[in-house]
Regions:
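A short SAM/SAH-binding and catalytic strip from SAM-dependent methyltransferases
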Residues: 89-104
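A short glycine-rich, Lys/Arg-flanked "PGG" loop and its adjoining helix->strand segment in the class I
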Residues: 107-119
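Conserved beta-strand signature within the Rossmann-like core of class I S-adenosyl-L-methionine
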Residues: 117-127
Length: 127
C-alpha cells in the first residue's frame, strides 16, 4: 500500500539527521518514505532499503544510486541484513502491512528489527 506524503514526512521526523549510522527502511516500494527521509536530510549513503519485489529493487537502485538496496524478505530480516548492515541502525522505518501477518511473524520481525537497532533508536511503523 503506497504511503501518502504527509504520513511519510511524519514517519521521517523520528529519524535522527545528524548521525552517520545506517537507517533501515523495510518495504520501500516506490520510495515515498525514502523520499521523505532524504528531504529531511538523511544522506542516501546511510539508507539500507530492504525490498522483496525485484522490480521495485531495480526502480530504487535507479532513483537512489547511493543507497544500499537489498533484495530480501523483511520477514527474514536477520538474513536480509546479514551482509548489508555494518553498524547498528539509528532507525528502522517500516511501511509493511504488519496486521495482515500472523502474530508470530509480526513479533519475529519486530524482535529482529530491535536486534538491528542501536540502543534507544526508534522503530517507526504504520499499519
Amino acid at each position: 500500500m503506497p504511503s501518502g506524503r504527509l504520513l511519510a514526512r511524519t514517519m521521517a521526523q523520528y529519524v535522527v539527521v545528524d548521525s552517520n549510522a545506517p537507517v533501515v527502511e523495510l518495504g520501500p516500494g516506490t520510495g515515498a518514505i525514502t523520499n521523505a527521509l532524504i528531504e529531511r536530510g538523511i544522506d542516501q549513503k546511510r539508507l539500507v532499503l530492504v525490498e522483496y519485489n525485484p522490480g521495485f529493487c531495480a526502480l530504487l537502485r535507479d532513483r537512489y544510486p547511493h543507497a544500499k538496496v537489498v533484495q530480501g524478505d523483511a520477514y527474514r530480516l536477520r538474513d536480509s541484513l546479514r551482509e548489508a548492515l555494518d553498524a547498528p541502525a539509528s532507525a528502522v522505518v517500516s511501511g509493511l502491512p504488519l496486521v495482515t501477518k500472523p502474530m508470530q511473524i509480526r513479533l519475529k520481525l519486530i524482535r529482529d528489527a530491535f536486534v538491528a537497532l542501536a540502543p534507544g533508536a526508534p522503530f517507526v511503523q504504520f499499519t
